[in-house]
């Protein structure tokens, strides 16, 4: 799909389709009014007859409108003008693109980017439109033998901006959006891959592909032998029950061209989580292939980063592992020695993500990082607390937390900060080891982050719990690509190349 921007009046557009908005109740947007005037009231006459009310998401496709150069006009319901918000805007764009894809139009000029969305500028509207369009067109069908195809797939969409002065802003928005969308697609493709294909070795292969494709990237793989030498007893214990070797992929992006401190992203990469000896219930266990969503998100963010060619140093860590039951698996009651030297009593082998992450978080101390952000499908408690809309954010460093919250608002990939008070640390106490890997039934998301915080004393750190946001269940099951957009926005902001609100 090709995207671009232009600045022009609707009556001069010669296209397969021109897209304009209609508000509720039957109120034409400014662009639609111009088309109505040229067509001598053709559009407003249809609205008076009740063909379109203007409710959000309604679509009406018109052919051969009098005096209009374009073959088709697509009227898009945008709801009440004053109530159009970010969520509605994205939904409208997604439905518009899907509708266009079914009409047989191979290209279209879209004026929805001129709609007023409260508090948002043209950069945001164009970027969100491109990201939403790419998201709506995504399908994971690489393993299907029969693939559905649109009769004449949409190939090009042009978003209109109000003035020529805004063209450079719109062009930058398209450029940023395409890079981010590419990262999101990478994240989705890897996360959606079945666990018999996507194991830790597969994750490592994907990390190596980035090195092969981009000059500023180098990738190294830490195998179990090296983990043993490093004393990563916690990480190794989790993978002990699987025939698939645990592998940690280190992706280094040297964008600054100097020795400035890197930002480090650490992704939990449990390519399948059966729960181990503390076996999960059978219902929905197929979705535990998504327990590597953190690693997929970091890989996607690194892909977007290299596409954007940002002038900063970033390291992505994919902590690949598989948690399986076997005679060699670790057990409840085991006491593990982590890379940091701290000991952990295992109360439940299904609280394994933190055991992998704690050693990865200790490992990254060697990079003398500017900041470390770990990303993990860590706790079911986060799904209970925040549902599928907000990623859980916990941090021991207020400025970093505020940066991430700002990036989440800018990108529309929302997060919500939860407390990380010392009061919760007591729930991890153990009579036999330094602490346990489980904090009890209460405040599960917070106690999991409290556990991780004990391994992050040497740098500024934040934790993103994406258990509720990494994938969708049900009929439309699949990876969402989150939090690639938020992470990339954070990196854009850090590089000084952000644009927009």
Swiss-Prot record:
SUPFAM superfamilies: Macro domain-like, Zn-dependent exopeptidases. Binds 2 manganese ions per subunit. It catalyses: Release of an N-terminal amino acid, Xaa-|-Yaa-, in which Xaa is preferably Leu, but may be other amino acids including Pro although not Arg or Lys, and Yaa may be Pro. Amino acid amides and methyl esters are also readily hydrolyzed, but rates on arylamides are exceedingly low; Release of an N-terminal amino acid, preferentially leucine, but not glutamic or aspartic acids. GO terms for biological process: proteolysis. Mn(2+) 2 binds at residues 268, 273, 291, 352. Disulfide bonds: none annotated. The active site is at 280, 354. Mn(2+) 1 binds at residues 273, 350, 352. Keywords: Aminopeptidase, Cytoplasm, Hydrolase, Manganese, Metal-binding, Protease. Its EC number is 3.4.11.1, 3.4.11.10. NCBIfam families: PRK00913.1-1, PRK00913.1-2, PRK00913.1-4. Presumably involved in the processing and regular turnover of intracellular proteins. Catalyzes the removal of unsubstituted N-terminal amino acids from various peptides. This is Probable cytosol aminopeptidase. It comes from Colwellia psychrerythraea (strain 34H / ATCC BAA-681). The gene is pepA.
């Amino acid at each position: 799909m090709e995207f671009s921007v232009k600045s022009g009046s609707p009556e001069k557009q010669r296209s397969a389709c021109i897209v304009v908005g209609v508000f509720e109740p039957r109120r034409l947007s400014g662009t639609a009014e111009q088309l109505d005037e040229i067509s001598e009231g053709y559009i407003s006459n249809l609205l008076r007859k009740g063909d379109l009310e203007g409710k959000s998401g309604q679509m009406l496709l018109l052919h051969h409108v009098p005096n209009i150069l374009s073959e088709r006009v697509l009227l898009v319901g945008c709801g009440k003008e004053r109530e159009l918000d970010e969520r509605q805007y994205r939904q409208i764009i997604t439905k518009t693109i899907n509708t266009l894809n079914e009409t047989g139009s191979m290209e279209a000029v879209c004026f929805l980017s001129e709609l007023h969305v409260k508090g948002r500028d043209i950069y945001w509207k164009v970027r969100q439109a491109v990201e939403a369009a790419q998201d709506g067109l995504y399908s994971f069908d690489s393993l299907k033998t029969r693939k559905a195809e649109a009769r004449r797939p949409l190939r090009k969409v042009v978003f209109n901006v109000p003035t020529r002065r805004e063209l450079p802003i719109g062009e930058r928005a398209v450029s940023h959006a395409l890079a981010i969308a590419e990262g999101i697609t990478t994240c989705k493709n890897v996360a959606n891959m079945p666990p018999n294909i996507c194991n830790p070795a597969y994750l490592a292969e994907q990390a190596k592909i980035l090195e092969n494709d981009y000059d500023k990237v180098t990738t190294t793989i830490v195998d179990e032998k090296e983990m043993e030498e490093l004393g990563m007893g916690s990480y190794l214990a989790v993978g002990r029950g699987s025939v698939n070797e645990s592998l940690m992929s280190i992706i280094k992006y040297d964008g600054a061209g100097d020795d400035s401190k890197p930002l480090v992203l650490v992704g939990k990469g449990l390519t399948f989580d059966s729960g181990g000896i503390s076996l999960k219930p059978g219902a929905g266990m197929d979705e535990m292939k998504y327990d590597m969503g953190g690693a997929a998100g970091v890989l996607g963010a690194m892909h977007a980063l290299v596409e954007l060619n940002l002038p900063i140093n970033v390291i992505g860590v994919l902590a690949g592992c598989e948690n399986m039951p076997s005679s060699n698996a670790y057990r409840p009651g085991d006491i593990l020695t982590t890379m940091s030297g701290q000991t952990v009593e295992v109360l439940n082998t299904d609280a394994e993500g933190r055991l992998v992450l704690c050693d990865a978080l200790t490992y990254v101390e060697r990079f003398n990082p500017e900041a470390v952000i770990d990303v993990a499908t860590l706790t079911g408690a986060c799904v209970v607390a925040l549902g599928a809309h907000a990623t859980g954010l916990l941090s021991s460093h207020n400025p970093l937390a505020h940066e991430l919250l700002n990036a989440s608002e800018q990108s529309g990939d929302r997060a919500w900060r939860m407390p990380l008070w010392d009061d919760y640390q007591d729930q991890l106490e153990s009579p036999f080891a330094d602490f346990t890997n489980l904090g009890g039934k209460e405040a599960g998301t917070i106690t999991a982050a409290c556990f991780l915080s004990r391994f992050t004393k040497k740098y500024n750190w934040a934790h993103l719990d994406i258990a509720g946001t990494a994938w969708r269940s049900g009929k439309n099951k699949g990876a969402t690509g989150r939090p690639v957009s938020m992470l990339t926005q954070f990196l854009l902001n850090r590089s000084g190349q952000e644009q927009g609100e």
